[in-house]
Each structure stands twice: as structure tokens, then as C-alpha cells.
Regions:
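Glycine-rich, low-complexity intrinsically disordered segments
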Residues: 1-146
Length: 146
């Protein structure tokens, strides 16, 4: 079950991340960003895009965030370095966006710790394997569907 938090003035976003190794994260994710890099050549922009995502969150003992560090250490020659990852974004208990990379690998990973807050944070930068498609779903409110 997904949990949603209410803040004064409205609902917070909520993320659910599912990785093919069995990892499911819901509570520790703070921010997700997606980007697509294309070539400057207009005629080939659609053929070779580089799709990336950056996930940041709190290092949590209740969820398997330590698995990100282990994933980042795998060399490119190891077939386990490629994983399927799905990110779902919810707002007001509705699925707003769902993006899946079917062959993702870690480009960069970092962890930061603070004595003042007592909480560690992680940043995971992943990219879709070259020339692989991504799946994306965008929610449309009922009044926009027709």
C-alpha cells in the first residue's frame, strides 16, 4: 500500500521505485529527475537519444538503499550491472507519471552523511543502455481525456 503525506496547503508528491532485483522503495525517495540528451543534428535527434534519471533520497535501514551502492560497484562486463527500473510518481493519490528503463546502468553514485541531521543521503545517476527504448505513461485528468 502506498502512503501519502499531507503538508499544509496540499498533498506531497510520492514516488515508488521498483528495480528488477526485487528492490522496492517508497519512503526514502525525495526527488527524481529525468533528462534526454539528443544530438544537435535535427535529422537524427530521434534515433540516438541518451535517457537518464537522477534519484535522490535518504539512506534508510528499513528499505534496501544499500543495494544502490552495490549496483554502482558492478563493472560493465558483469551482466548484472544492467537492471530494469520503474519510477512511479503519485500526486493526490493518482498516478501522474510512470517511466521504465528496461536496461539501466549506474553512471554515478554518491552518499553524504551529516552529524547535524543524523541522516545520510544518496544520489543515484542512471542511464538507459544506448539504443534501448523507454516506456513512459503520463496521467491525464478526466476533463482532458477525449
Amino acid at each position: 500500500m502506498l502512503k501519502f503525506s499531507v503538508r499544509k496547503g496540499g498533498w506531497l508528491n510520492m514516488y515508488k521505485i521498483t528495480i528488477s532485483d526485487g528492490t522496492i522503495l517508497k519512503e526514502s525517495i525525495e526527488h527524481v529527475s529525468f533528462s534526454t540528451e539528443t544530438t544537435n543534428d535535427y535529422n537524427s535527434r530521434h534515433t540516438n537519444p541518451r535517457n537518464s534519471m537522477i534519484i535522490t533520497g535518504k539512506i534508510d535501514t528499513d528499505e534496501k538503499t544499500a543495494g544502490f551502492y552495490k549496483w554502482a560497484l558492478l563493472p560493465g562486463s558483469n551482466p548484472e550491472c544492467y537492471k530494469e527500473i520503474t519510477v512511479e510518481q503519485y500526486q493526490k493519490e493518482l498516478l501522474v507519471r510512470k517511466v521504465s528503463f528496461n536496461k539501466a546502468f549506474v553512471v554515478d553514485y554518491s552518499e553524504n552523511y551529516s552529524n547535524s541531521t543524523g541522516v545520510g543521503t544518496f544520489t543515484l545517476y542512471i542511464r538507459q543502455f544506448f539504443a534501448k527504448d523507454i516506456e513512459s505513461f503520463t496521467y491525464k485528468p478526466i476533463y482532458e481525456r477525449q
